[in-house]
């Protein structure tokens, strides 16, 4: 009987902890903000995709994702950034 009580207790605690973890992640879902911009050259051939940060962020940014999965925060007003976005959009169309 003791192993059954222990199993019930472990199941209850595990369920409660998973619910707590899920609730904590839910508060920031979809909210990724850039604190600073990348100032180096943008490696066009290594870019996979891009997205714009949320309006809730204090700094507007374009985030490029490389083929290695690295995120690069970029200034949306920068000419190189605009060219990189156009490049990726042209790849999507073809």
Curated annotation (Swiss-Prot):
Main location (coarse class): secreted
Induction (UniProt): In monocytes, up-regulated by IL4 and by GM-CSF/CSF2 in an IRF4-dependent manner (at protein level).
GO cellular component: extracellular region; extracellular space
Disulfide bonds: 33-57, 34-73
Signal peptide: 1-23
Tissue and organ expression note: Constitutively expressed in thymus. Detected at lower levels in the lung, colon and small intestine. Expressed in stimulated peripheral blood mononuclear cells, but not in resting cells.
PROSITE patterns: SMALL_CYTOKINES_CC
Any one GO biological process: inflammatory response
UniProt KW keywords: Chemotaxis, Cytokine, Disulfide bond, Inflammatory response, Secreted, Signal
Location of this chain's protein in the cell: Secreted
A GO MF term: chemokine activity
Role description: Chemokine, which displays chemotactic activity for T lymphocytes, preferentially Th2 cells, but not monocytes or granulocytes. Therefore plays an important role in a wide range of inflammatory and immunological processes. Acts by binding to CCR4 at T-cell surface. Mediates GM-CSF/CSF2-driven pain and inflammation. In the brain, required to maintain the typical, highly branched morphology of hippocampal microglia under homeostatic conditions.
Family, similarity comment: Belongs to the intercrine beta (chemokine CC) family.
Name of the featured protein: C-C motif chemokine 17
Origin species: Homo sapiens (Human)
Lineage: Eukaryota, Metazoa, Chordata, Craniata, Vertebrata
Name of the gene this protein is made from: CCL17
């Amino acid at each position: 009987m003791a192993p059954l009580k222990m199993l019930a207790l472990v199941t209850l605690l595990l369920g409660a902890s998973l619910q707590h973890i899920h609730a904590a992640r839910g508060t920031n879902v979809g909210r990724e903000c850039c604190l600073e911009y990348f100032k180096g050259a943008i490696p066009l051939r290594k870019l996979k995709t891009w997205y714009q940060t949320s309006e809730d962020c204090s700094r507007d940014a374009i985030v490029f994702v490389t083929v290695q999965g690295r995120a690069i925060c970029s200034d949306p007003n920068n000419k190189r950034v605009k060219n990189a976005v156009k490049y990726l959009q042209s790849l999507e169309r073809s």
